[in-house]
Amino acid sequence: MNQKVKSIFVVLLSLAIVSCEVERGGVDNPVTQGERPYVIASQGTFSNTTTNALLTASTLDSGVVGMDQGLVNDGASYWVFWGDKYLYGLTYNQGNAGTTRSYVMNEDYTLSARSAEYAVRRFTTVGTYNKYIMTTSTGDGPQEYADENGFLPKSILVSLLDVEAETYTTNNTLEEHYLAENFLGNGEFVTLAGIEQVGSKIYSAAVPMGLSQYGVKAEGGKWVREGYADLIKRESGGSGSGAYKEGELQWTQYPDECWVAIFEDESLSTKRLIRTDKISYAAGRNKSQYYQMIWRTESGDVYVFSPSYAKTMADERQRTTLPAGVVRINSGSEEFDPRYYVNIEAMADGRSFLRTWYVGGSKFLMLMYDSVLEPAKTMTATELAIFDAEAATLTPVTGLPAKSSISGFGSTPYAEGGKVYIPVTLTDNYPAIYIIDAESAVATKGLTIQATQISGVGRLEPINS
């Protein structure tokens, strides 16, 4: 699959840093003039100093590349390849804005930073739509909408980066359609997970988050389900993405359903909601990030995955009974296909998955948990599998290093020509790009990077080519 201009490659810096320091080596894989080179986002810790560098290579199939000739940068939380034209480094800071800038490939195959920098506000999901890189999160709405108790409603916060014009805009939350409260008609507020362009529209999973302080009090408390009032927090507590306030009902009361919002455009002003009770909500979770689980394929069909993350909830009432699975919205339709459902857990010894990525044809790469999802359990995910949506098969990937040696994967693979290229960071050696044959699910070792971490890979064309 060669990703087009509107496609997205997103790379989250979630990999563990290799515990031992390594020495930097030289480049033996120089860029060949006339080729469209690969770009690799790397990080190295040498002599107690951490350096981030964007590297180039003429192939990912073999060789060794060092950090010496890379473009040093400040690093990023997400590296977004906007097709093969621009590379954006988005920085996420918990609760705050982070600095974002973009890069291009010059005619001489060197990389350079573009002039504009942006302070992008916090986000929990990211995607592309038309000319934009688009991020969203859910946060406090405007003071003008405060209730009689002074509680603020939750609103959807949208940021739009116009990649050609190098401009950055945010939404006006005074516009009522951005309210996240009672989004699904059950009183709960939502956050969006995934931004997938389907034709001229945006498909996104609407993930119910429970009742905010505002939602608990709304309409005399009508949205608190019978028998659930004891779930309302009596004091503030928690930390990070698990923080809560006194008077809110944290996490959804409706874990056994999945909603998809279909928006007309980036304004989110007009939407259609569709629901299925075959799967739980469609989002992978890691701290405050909501991983995309909704993907359009080359055929136009849209597949919606649920890892059933709600199985980890402490209270049984908020714990889903549905296994991790996948449903489909057929090309040209805006309804779930009632005939299509695949139980992923049944094919994976009861295990679920943390991430999914579309890699071409009817194939998806899945990052599988090592054990079943349970409450209060520390989960690791060091196995990969190929899911064929048309054949409804799940094939474990072979040929990877031993699980005990893997400390993480690059957050988004690069796919072309039936092959999937994914960075693998190791505890006992340099990280490397592994090449997975999407048909056979066999992985082979490719390019080695003399660094401590690879956070992503993609391709860029020279700007005037």
Predicted regions and their residues:
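C-terminal motif of bacterial Sec signal peptides marking the signal peptidase cleavage site
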Residues: L15-S19
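Acidic/polar, low-complexity intrinsically disordered N-terminal segments immediately downstream
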Residues: C20-H177, L192-G194, V198-V207, T425, ...
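Beta-propeller blade signature
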Residues: L54-S58, T100-V104, F151-T167, K217-S269, ...
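Beta-propeller fold detector
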Residues: S62-G75, Y109-V120, A165-G185, T270-S280, ...
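Repeated scaffold domains used in trafficking and secretory/extracellular systems
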Residues: V72-D84, A116-K131, A180-I195, Y281-I294, ...
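Short coil/turn segments that connect the beta-strands within blades of beta-propeller domains
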Residues: D84-K85, N130-K131, G199-S200, S299-D301, ...
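Beta-propeller domains
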Residues: Q253-F336, G350-R351
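Intrinsically disordered, low-complexity segments enriched in Gly and acidic/Ser/Thr residues
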Residues: D337-Y430
